[in-house]
Amino acid sequence: MATTMAKLITLVVLAILAFVEVSVSGYKTSISTITIEDNGRCTKSIPPICFPDGRP
């Protein structure tokens, strides 16, 4: 019983980690795209706030 439970927990943890990794890489991609488009005029908050008209 304990080994089955441990295997189940391991699978759940791996699934969560895989999902988080995908989310993070997607988020990093969107941040770098935004930053390039706006020449880096973005706040470092989540979600990033950007000012395309050049305000700080």
Curated annotation (Swiss-Prot):
<feature type="propeptide">
    <location>
        <begin position="54"/>
        <end position="56"/>
    </location>
</feature>
<feature type="disulfide bond">
    <location>
        <begin position="42"/>
        <end position="50"/>
    </location>
</feature>
<keyword id="KW-1015">Disulfide bond</keyword>
<feature type="signal peptide">
    <location>
        <begin position="1"/>
        <end position="25"/>
    </location>
</feature>
<dbReference type="GO" id="GO:0010951">
    <property type="term" value="P:negative regulation of endopeptidase activity"/>
</dbReference>
<feature type="cross-link" description="Cyclopeptide (Gly-Asp)">
    <location>
        <begin position="40"/>
        <end position="53"/>
    </location>
</feature>
<protein>
    <recommendedName>
        <fullName>Trypsin inhibitor 1</fullName>
    </recommendedName>
</protein>
<keyword id="KW-0646">Protease inhibitor</keyword>
<feature type="propeptide">
    <location>
        <begin position="26"/>
        <end position="39"/>
    </location>
</feature>
<dbReference type="GO" id="GO:0004866">
    <property type="term" value="F:endopeptidase inhibitor activity"/>
</dbReference>
<feature type="site" description="Reactive bond">
    <location>
        <begin position="44"/>
        <end position="45"/>
    </location>
</feature>
<keyword id="KW-0722">Serine protease inhibitor</keyword>
<dbReference type="GO" id="GO:0002020">
    <property type="term" value="F:protease binding"/>
</dbReference>
<comment type="function">
    <text>Inhibits trypsin, cathepsin G, elastase, chymotrypsin and thrombin. Does not inhibit factor Xa.</text>
</comment>
<keyword id="KW-0732">Signal</keyword>
<dbReference type="GO" id="GO:0004867">
    <property type="term" value="F:serine-type endopeptidase inhibitor activity"/>
</dbReference>
